[in-house]
Swiss-Prot record:
Top EC group: transferase
Protein family according to the UniProt entry: Belongs to the CoaE family.
Organism annotation: Synechococcus sp. (strain JA-3-3Ab) (Cyanobacteria bacterium Yellowstone A-Prime)
Binding annotation for ATP: A11, T12, G13, K14, S15, T16
Identification of the protein by name: Dephospho-CoA kinase
Pfam families: CoaE
Localization (cell): Cytoplasm
Metabolic or biological pathway, per its Swiss-Prot or TrEMBL entry: Cofactor biosynthesis; coenzyme A biosynthesis; CoA from (R)-pantothenate: step 5/5
Keyword Transcription: no
Domain of life: Bacteria
GO BP terms in the entry: coenzyme A biosynthetic process
Gene this protein is translated from: coaE
Enzyme Commission number(s): 2.7.1.24
DPCK domain sequence ranges: 3-225
PANTHER family for this protein: BIFUNCTIONAL COENZYME A SYNTHASE-RELATED, DEPHOSPHO-COA KINASE-RELATED
Amino acid sequence: MRIIGLTGGIATGKSTVARILERHGIPVADADQMARQALAVGSPIRERVLQRYGRAIQDPSGALDRRQLGRIVFADAAERAWLEAQIHPFVKARLREFLEAHGASAPPEEATEARPSCQCPHGEGHPTVCLMIPLLFEAHMENWASEIWVVTCTPEQQRQRLAQRDLLTAAEIEARLASQWPLEEKARRAHVVLDNSGSLAQLEAQVRQALGAHPREGGAICPTPPSRIE
């Protein structure tokens, strides 16, 4: 089975690539959506978060103020690490369920390889699935995928998209960018690099080319220098 690990920098266009893949009939698991589910009303994780931060992350109606929570954790690495320690196990469990539902198996929980593994999970199911994991490298989850795709754009585009999409201040944008690996390092470790600095049509063409290239044998892909899809 071909398991695409889709990642990149914040606001580089990962969700756009995911939608393109879905139009090609490829199932996509969204780790960000799973993280939001972890903080849903009634979840024990949400209760622990509220116990830790209290009214500081609640709006006047009592609902969870995600932007205020973001201000706290992106300003303090220790708080961000605590929050990730609450959410990541939940997300990994949901990703594991997704893979099993499509006939694959996730790596052992103790396995943490620094590079993508040549041992691709086997199974009878959909021939290609995608795990969209924004923090794939930061969470050391490279070995969950048989190949890694990194979506890039220019730094100026990243900042512009964050300002328009999330209504963040310049300081908030820089804090979020600083919390992730440099985009250049992610691209260096990728099997496929998708340049999303152009048009949607150009991005779609790159995705089609990457899907067709499929440089594998026997259901696995070995670490190779990244392929830049133009």
